[in-house]
């Protein structure tokens, strides 16, 4: 493992901008509004050859522990456990505030080395704040501008004596780990995104899987803003072995007309982006509300993106008429998602843990189908049988000739059908072939792409 460096500070001092600067990507949402970050976010950082894991945290606020800001602070405090260094960030232009002083008192009680950073130090406006920062008791602050990348060399000099040797120790282990990883199929890490409407229990579900309060939860809708990726090992009780999973928690997605807040728009866009990087997407429903139109829109979006889809009815422990609810949702899904019938539907409880092993088992199975490749010979044997059972129509008395089919890609499975006059092939016959591929060749409820290709007419102008 790399050395771990966490970023701590009050809201809106530029912690997420610093995080993005160090990882070299815009992974964390950034806005002028304070309190954008709510959950811890991890990233691989490299600073002038110094490699470490950087952790962005929620802004530190002096609030009651039962409130949302109070629970965010508890998450930030928990991030100190196991950290090698803490970057304590203040706003040089604002100077030292009473909340900065409170954070400093807390950090002085910790055994974690502290690097004080005076962010927003570009120009002369930050000079008084840099001078004030000495009063916090952590020595000379690193004058920095996360927005413009100024002060990277000074930060490197501050971190090198604290994690440089640890990085050298880890490098040897890393080389061994890389050698071991080369023996594994890269498909073995399941990239699993959790999506759904706000307050469906997505973060509670992930916390139950992990066995810790890793993500903020509560009755307030829309707590999660960033898409948070967590690498984790699931113990498969059937195999009696651990299997690697990358869990991706996303912001709740409401109807577009209801999304007026700029931050929520950023969060929904981030959730859509997370789906792109997932292999399997679990759409979480709230059993107390059932299936709504917005759920079908989210499911359709996942299918359009070509991801393997599963539906999990959460809060099953408080569902009324469970049997009727399950059957009603099953029927509505089959009618509303005609392009992918038989999507896996599971009843779970993020609070009690009911059905979670079954959920992970089904996720690995549908990912295997999503990644499957059928040999061309076997594919065309099925194709010949399908044509014999139901020949293509002959519009206007002229026969549509279907020659052969091949699988062009996987993840999602994509097939190319070759023939003549394919522009006149009815959509119903195309669906017949897609459903046959899914049913007969073991693709289950995976989205299938079928491209029609006719030979070019050499005499056409």
Curated annotation (Swiss-Prot):
For this protein, the record's InterPro entries field holds:
G_ENGA (IPR031166), GTP-bd (IPR006073), GTPase_Der (IPR016484), KH_dom-like (IPR032859), KH_dom-like_a/b (IPR015946), P-loop_NTPase (IPR027417), Small_GTP-bd (IPR005225)
Q: Which Pfam families match?
A: KH_dom-like, MMR_HSR1
Which PROSITE patterns does the record match to this protein? G_ENGA
Q: Which residues bind GTP 1?
A: 9-16, 56-60, 119-122
Note the Gene3D superfamilies from the entry: 3.30.300.20, P-loop containing nucleotide triphosphate hydrolases
Any idea which UniProt keywords this protein has?
GTP-binding, Nucleotide-binding, Repeat, Ribosome biogenesis
Chain sites annotated for binding GTP 2 = 196-203, 249-253, 314-317
Please state every residue range assigned to the domain named EngA-type G: 3-167, 190-371
Which family is annotated? Belongs to the TRAFAC class TrmE-Era-EngA-EngB-Septin-like GTPase superfamily. EngA (Der) GTPase family.
- What does the protein in this record do? GTPase that plays an essential role in the late steps of ribosome biogenesis.
PANTHER family registered for this protein in UniProt: GTPASE DER (PTHR43834:SF6)
Output the NCBIfam families linked to this UniProt entry.
GTPase_EngA (TIGR03594), small_GTP (TIGR00231)
Q: How does it assemble?
A: Associates with the 50S ribosomal subunit.
Record protein name field: GTPase Der
């Amino acid at each position: 493992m790399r050395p771990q460096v966490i970023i701590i500070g009050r809201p809106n001092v530029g912690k997420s901008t610093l995080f993005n600067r160090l990882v070299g990507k815009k992974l964390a949402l950034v806005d002028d509004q304070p309190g954008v970050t709510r959950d811890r976010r991890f990233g691989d950082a490299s600073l002038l050859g110094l490699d470490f894991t950087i952790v962005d945290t929620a802004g530190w606020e002096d609030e009651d522990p039962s409130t949302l800001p109070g629970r965010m602070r508890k998450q930030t405090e928990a991030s100190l456990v196991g950290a090698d260094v803490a970057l304590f960030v203040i706003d040089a232009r604002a100077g030292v505030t009473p909340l900065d002083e409170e954070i400093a008192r807390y950090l002085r009680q910790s055994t974690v080395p502290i690097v004080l950073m005076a962010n927003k130090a570009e120009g002369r406006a930050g000079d008084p704040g840099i001078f004030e920062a000495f009063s916090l008791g952590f020595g000379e602050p690193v004058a920095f501008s996360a927005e413009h990348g100024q002060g990277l060399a000074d930060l490197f000099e501050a971190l090198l004596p604290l994690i440089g040797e640890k990085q050298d120790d880890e490098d040897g282990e890393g080389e061994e780990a890389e050698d071991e990883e080369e023996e594994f199929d890269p498909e073995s890490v399941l990239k699993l995104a959790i999506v759904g409407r706000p307050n469906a229990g997505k973060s509670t579900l992930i916390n139950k899987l992990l066995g810790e309060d890793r993500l903020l939860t509560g009755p307030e809708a829309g707590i999660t803003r960033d898409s948070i990726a967590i690498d984790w090992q699931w113990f498969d009780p059937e195999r009696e072995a651990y299997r690697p999973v990358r869990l991706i928690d996303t912001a709740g997605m409401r109807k577009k007309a209801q999304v007026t807040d700029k931050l929520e728009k950023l969060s929904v866009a981030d959730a859509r982006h997370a789906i792109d990087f997932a292999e399997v997407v679990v759409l979480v429903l709230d059993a107390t509300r059932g299936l709504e139109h917005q759920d079908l829109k989210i499911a359709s979006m996942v299918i359009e993106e070509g991801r393997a889809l599963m539906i999990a009815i959460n809060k099953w422990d408080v569902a009324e008429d469970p049997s009727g609810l399950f059957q009603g949702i099953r029927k509505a899904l089959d009618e509303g998602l005609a392009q992918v019938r038989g999507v896996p539907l599971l009843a779970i409880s993020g609070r009690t843990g009911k059905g979670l092993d079954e959920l992970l088992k089904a996720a690995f199975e549908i990912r295997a189908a999503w990644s499957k490749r059928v040999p061309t010979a076997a594919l065309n044997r099925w194709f010949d049988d399908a044509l014999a059972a139901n020949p293509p129509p002959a519009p206007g008395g002229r026969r549509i000739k279907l020659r052969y089919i091949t699988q062009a890609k996987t993840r999602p499975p994509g097939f190319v059908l070759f023939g003549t006059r394919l522009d006149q092939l009815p959509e119903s016959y195309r669906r017949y072939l897609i459903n046959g591929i899914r049913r007969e060749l073991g693709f289950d409820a995976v989205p299938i792409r079928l491209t029609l290709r006719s030979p070019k007419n050499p005499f056409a102008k």
